[in-house]
Design a protein with these regions (language model features):
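Residues within mature, well-folded domains
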Residues: 17-102
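Bacterial N-terminal signal peptides that target proteins for export
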Residues: 1-5
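Hydrophobic helical h-region of N-terminal Sec-dependent signal peptides
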Residues: 6-10
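N-terminal signal peptide c-region/cleavage motif recognized by signal peptidases
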Residues: 13-15
């Protein structure tokens, strides 16, 4: 009974659903975490939104130096109601998250 009520409550909700993945298909091409921003843009085209979120201070113990790494978020979609959120740190793709909006 509890499971039925929980499923009924979820079915009626207008929440945003999301999940993370390490690859994204753009047409016949794939992009993966670790790819460079220009490679993603070549394969997927211009995002519908592109925003600089800020910078993050990193420290390289090998070279004993710190540097600021630029953090960006690109959004692609909607594709069948799904938006793809791509996060770049220092020009490298570090996270791909898909979100469906109801």
């Amino acid at each position: 009974m509890l499971i039925t009520l929980t499923l009924a409550a979820l079915a009626g909700s207008t929440a945003t659903f999301s999940y993370a993945t390490s690859t994204l298909r753009c047409g016949s091409q794939l992009v993966s975490t670790g790819d460079r921003a220009f490679e993603v843009q070549q394969k997927c085209g211009e995002p519908v939104s592109q925003e600089v979120l800020g910078t993050q201070e990193t420290f390289n113990s090998t070279y004993r130096r710190s540097e600021a790494v630029r953090i960006e978020e690109w959004i692609y979609g909607p594709d069948n109601g799904m938006y793809q959120y791509l996060r770049f740190e220092g020009g490298r793709l570090v996270r791909i998250e898909s979100k469906r909006r109801n």
